[in-house]
A protein has these predicted regions:
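Cell-envelope/extracellular polymer assembly enzymes that use nucleotide-activated donors
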Residues: 2-5, 33, 173
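Conserved nucleotide-sugar donor-binding catalytic segment
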Residues: 113, 127-216, 220
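Short aromatic/hydrophobic "clamp" motif used to bind/position activated sugar donors
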Residues: 83
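N-proximal low-complexity "stem/linker" segments adjacent to membrane-targeting elements
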Residues: 1-26
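Glycine-rich, basic loop-to-helix element that forms the pyrophosphate-binding segment
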Residues: 20, 45, 61-78, 96
Length: 277
């Protein structure tokens, strides 16, 4: 059985598309199909698709109504057991990434790895290490990187495709429905899967995302649960503030002790001064 469908969507990002295609083609693991959905790009994307056409299982270049419409097109074409969405400009961490992952013999509904987020090139960015356990509170605060998340294709038939009325948060909504509400089996794999391009995450997009998430939460959960999530968020921020204050005060006390006379101050006295704040 075909294990994986890699779905790439693209719009006027020819250079990023080329990088993504090369990354997919270089994979030493080969039990996958590669689907590219292009939104009728006007740059060099079509030339790149034609150049690599013999290494792409299916591609199309036509108008769509947005990101999630394009992703849903890819899902409906897909034949693999799992779907992975690798946007144009994103690329695998190494040529043996998929081999490492599928040699684990995974069978969970959703499994997800880690990622490296970059803004300009892969040398400038940071790793995102995902949690082993996914909770409602985790999704309330953030999400998981969809470029490093493998989803059983049958889940889209069970719980519906991505909500095309949303601009940014439809994958987040799907994760909550599948993982939190319907308790799908998940597994975190300690493998870096992708470098992903975050240059499209503008402040405007963040505002839209927050608004959409608020609407989704109000539709899916009663107010009393949301109230508890907000309380947890406020408590966590308060604890973080307390910890920062403690560290700052400890630093100032230690600096003062050292400035006075380090050689004459026993270590136990130093520690007593630091922790008696």
């Amino acid at each position: 059985m075909l294990q994986l469908s890699i779905i790439t969507i693209n719009l006027n990002n020819g250079n990023g598309l080329r990088k993504t295609i090369e990354s997919v083609v270089e994979q030493t693991y080969k039990n996958f199909e590669f689907i590219v959905i292009d939104g009728s790009s006007s740059d060099n994307s079509l030339d790149i698709l034609k150049r690599f056409s013999d290494q792409i299982s299916f591609w199309v270049s036509e108008k769509d109504s947005g990101i999630y419409n394009a992703m849903n097109k890819g899902i409906k074409i897909a034949r693999g057991e799992y779907c992975l969405f690798l946007n144009s400009g994103d690329f695998f961490f190494s040529s043996d990434t998929l081999l490492k992952i599928f040699s684990l013999g995974l069978s969970e509904d959703v499994f997800y790895g880690d990622s490296f987020r970059f803004d300009n090139d892969k040398k400038k960015g940071f790793f995102i290490i995902e949690p082993d356990n996914l909770t409602l509170y985790h999704f309330f605060r953030k999400s998981i990187c969809h470029q490093s998340t493998f989803i059983k294709r049958e889940l889209f038939k069970k719980f519906g495709y991505y909500n095309e009325q949303l601009q940014i948060a439809a994958d987040w909504e799907f994760n909550i429905k599948a993982i939190i509400i319907n308790n799908c089996l998940t597994r975190h794999i300690n493998i870096p899967v992708v470098y992903y391009d975050a240059r499209g995450l503008s402040n405007t997009n963040r505002e839209i995302s927050l608004k959409e998430r608020g609407l989704i939460l109000n539709q899916l959960f009663p107010k009393r649960i949301l109230a508890d999530l907000i309380r947890l968020e406020l408590l966590e921020k308060e604890l973080l503030s307390i910890n920062k204050s403690f560290i700052f005060k400890a630093y100032r006390k230690l600096k003062k002790i050292l400035a006075n006379n380090l050689s004459e101050t026993p270590i136990n006295v130093m520690l007593l001064h630091i922790f008696t704040l």
